[in-house]
Structures are given as structure tokens and as C-alpha cells.
């Protein structure tokens, strides 16, 4: 079963819509430069009102490990998602969140050596792969090129859990799952009406598309 994370949650209404649709995880963006940014106070208020067994993830770009630890504790986050090359092995090990996801932005020249090296130095085995755009940590709405994605996800299978992000929406997520069989898929802009606000119909359509792709993969003819 492919897990589903709806990222860039800013309101309780959107959080509950995602949960009711079947999302397994919600992402809260604490980067001050993001149009989907939330304050720790807002995130904590939303998280306290969602049902149990939903994984809550904090997205961090420019925060120090101490700041990340403080926000994770205050908001009761299950997971810290670390964007940017600033989070090397040393700084990642200083993050005390229950679980850590390290983000890698994958262009055509992306080398898996950096993933292997990071995993070896930290013991972290959860990776999110997003499309590369110069100067942006993620959330570009662009997809990883097919050949690159196939190579990355094939090689990551022996290292850890690989999450696919980058331009995913109801119209293409099924194809992406069939292409690379990710552990999970992650979307933000693909289910929005405007940046920071979700379109609930798109969320439901996204979840249905994931479930349909999973059903196709598990059928005897697959």
C-alpha cells in the first residue's frame, strides 16, 4: 500500500478533509519563505484536533537543529522533514524528532552516492526525492524526469524508504506509482485551489488515484 502525505496544511478544515479522504500523513511547513508557512502555534492547534494514527510531519528549510527540536516538541510532531543541503550528517544527528526524512532534489545528474553516504553516517533511512530547481528547496510543482526517477527508486530499495514528490496531482500520481513503486507519495500544490489552501475535491481525487494504482499493482494480471 502506497502511503499518502498531504503537505502544506494551514487550516484544520483542510487537515480533516485530508484525513477523511484517506491520507496517512500531514505536512506542516515552517519555512518562513513558503506560501504555505504556518506558525508553531497554528500547527499545534490543528494537530491537537486531528484523529489519532495520523503521522504529523514538520517541514524545515532554514531552522537550526535546536529550533527544529523545539518546534517538534511544542507541536507534538512525529517526524522532521529536512530540506536543503545545510542539513548534513552532523546537523541531522542533532535533530531529536522521533523520525527524520531527508529530502534530496533530483536532477538528471543526481548521484546516489550522496544518499548512501548520508545513510551510512546517520543511520537515517527515510528519503524524499523532489524535482531539482536552482535556488528552491522544493514545492516547485515540477516532476522528476522519468529515467532519473526509475534509477533513483530502484537503487534506494536497498537503502531505505523512498518517498516521491514533485508535481504530483490526481491526473499523474497513478502513473508515477506504476513507474517507480514508491513507499509513499507527497503532494502540496497538486491538491490546492490557491497556495496554502486545499481543494478538497482534488484531495479526494488524489487519494482515489493512489488507491486505484495500488489495486492495479496487486491484481493477478499486474
UniProtKB/Swiss-Prot annotation:
Q: Which reaction does it catalyse?
A: N-(5-phospho-beta-D-ribosyl)anthranilate = 1-(2-carboxyphenylamino)-1-deoxy-D-ribulose 5-phosphate
Isomerase: is it a keyword of this entry? yes
Q: What are the record keywords, sorted?
A: Amino-acid biosynthesis, Aromatic amino acid biosynthesis, Isomerase, Tryptophan biosynthesis
Q: In which pathway does it act?
A: Amino-acid biosynthesis; L-tryptophan biosynthesis; L-tryptophan from chorismate: step 3/5
Recorded hits in Gene3D superfamilies, A to Z, give: Aldolase class I
GO molecular function term, any single one: phosphoribosylanthranilate isomerase activity
* InterPro entries, sorted: Aldolase_TIM, PRAI_dom, RibuloseP-bd_barrel, TrpF_fam
Write the Enzyme Commission number(s) for this entry.
5.3.1.24
Biological process terms from the Gene Ontology for this record are: L-tryptophan biosynthetic process
S-adenosyl-L-methionine is among the record's keywords? no
Give the family per the record.
Belongs to the TrpF family.
Q: Under which name does UniProt file this protein?
A: N-(5'-phosphoribosyl)anthranilate isomerase
What organism is recorded for this protein?
Prosthecochloris aestuarii (strain DSM 271 / SK 413)
**Gene for this protein?**
trpF
